[in-house]
Structure formats: C-alpha cells, structure tokens
Amino acid sequence: MSVLKDNIDVSSLTTVKINPNEKQNKVEKGDLFFMTSSETKEEVALCSTLSYDVKNLYLNSFCFGYRVNNLNLINNEYLNCLLHSPKYRKQISNLGQGFTRVNISKNKLLELLVEVPDMKQQIRIVSINNKINYKINSEINKLNKLNELKKGLMQNMFV
C-alpha cells in the first residue's frame, strides 16, 4: 500500500499470511497513514487517508496509522490536506533524522500542533483541494495520452 498520495489506492493492496499469534493493528475507513522512513526529508511522514471500508485490512511495518477520535472536531481529510501543505511539510521534514534513510519518530510527529478551523471551513477546504486534485489528475491523464500519441507518431515518421 502506497501512502505517498492523498488517498490509498485500494486496488493496489496485496495479501499476506498472518499467523494467529501475531498482533496486528486493524485499519478503518478514515484512518491516516504515515511513512516512517524515506530516502529524503521531503518524503518522510507523507500521509494518506483510507477512504473506503476494507475488510481484514491491517497496518504494515513501514508506516504507522492515526485515527481521529473526534470527527466532530476535525475532519480526517482536512487533516490529511493540512499535513500536505508547505507549512506543515516543512515542520514535519525538520523532524526527520538520518542520512542514508530519513526516519521520523511517531511520538515527535504526534506532538505537532495543528490549526483546526470550524467544521464548515474544514469541509470547504477539503472540497477545494479535491476539485484541484481532480483537475490536476485530468491534466496529467491528458498529458500522458499526448505523450503516447507523440511517441507513436515519432515511431511512424522515422521508419
């Protein structure tokens, strides 16, 4: 499961065998996941939200999860959006330690103070962010199709 994007792509999930004596942390819709280790400070603790109900889904050892306990106070998608903002990415990347691999302490990350506007404003921010991300993804898809078209044309031009 990749947590490098805003939302987890459930189609990319794989299965593993879990022994009965292994303790596993079950994840739920709305949970946030953070990378604990990265090659760069800029990617350490990037987070992603699970937007779907998935049965028997457990946390892996490469990331840690966070569950918002009071959804009346903070919207999990807003928190994800906030933690991707340049202001918070800078604070989070400064918490990363290491040279070859940059690691982050879960406890240090959980000490981070975040701005929490009223719920109406949080939902507005999430809506705007989702619309922008949709537009970006649409443009990326168009660019990819144009690049494929160009590649095909170039191959046919110089046969």
Feature map (PLM): residue ranges:
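Sequence-specific dsDNA recognition surfaces
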Residues: 1-33
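Short, Lys/Arg- and Gly-enriched loop/turn segments at beta-strand edges
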Residues: 41-48
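Amphipathic alpha-helical coiled-coil/heptad-repeat segments
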Residues: 108-111, 115-159
